Curated annotation (Swiss-Prot):
Main function: Nucleotide-binding protein.
Cited Pfam families: DUF520
Species the sequence originates in: Burkholderia ambifaria (strain ATCC BAA-244 / DSM 16087 / CCUG 44356 / LMG 19182 / AMMD) (Burkholderia cepacia (strain AMMD))
Protein name, per record: Nucleotide-binding protein Bamb_2603
Protein family: Belongs to the YajQ family.
Length: 161
């Protein structure tokens, strides 16, 4: 029986490349001259450092621009609150989301069942497996999910016949 998995995962290699490009641009930009603005990464956690709130916004804009150029969806980013770290310096922790959350998985399963397409959807960890008898049914489910779920970027992989 044909099947595929619905997942939500950012390409961490491209995220790392975007961070390196952001740091390079920040170090050469005139408006950041003499400031301690930078982006650091620890696994799925990014930390933005800047001298004040305005420069933090500029660092965030540079990072978003570089991520977009590398085809990483910015909806993967979950922004924490801005913290003061001594003097005027500020930092913000940004988490890169991974996996389909429980609520989203239930929503996907409900959408698939309500669509009356002859397929079955089951939650498997941080992915949703959709199986059906016809490949055309699976392709119509993919089209329907792309149209209905807009708040989280979805990937469809592990397509088996």
């Amino acid at each position: 029986m044909p099947s595929f998995d619905v997942v939500s995962e950012a390409n961490m290699i491209e995220v790392k490349n975007a961070i390196e490009q952001s740091n390079k641009e920040i170090s050469t930009r005139f408006d950041f001259k003499g400031s301690d603005a930078r982006v650091e990464q620890k696994e799925r956690e990014l930390t933005l450092f800047a001298d004040d709130d305005f420069k933090l916004g500029q660092v965030k804009d540079v990072l978003i621009n570089k991520l977009a150029k590398r085809n990483v969806d910015v909806r993967f980013l979950d922004y924490g609150k801005v913290e003061k770290i001594g003097g005027d310096k500020v930092k913000q922790i940004v988490t890169v989301k991974k996996g389909v959350t429980g609520d989203l998985a239930k929503k996907i399963v409900r959408l698939v069942k309500d669509s009356k397409i002859k397929v079955q959807a089951s939650i498997q960890g941080d992915a949703v497996r959709v199986t059906g008898t016809k490949r055309d049914d699976l392709q119509s489910v993919i089209a329907m999910l792309r149209k209905e779920v807009t708040d989280t970027p979805l990937d469809f992989n592990n397509f088996r016949d």
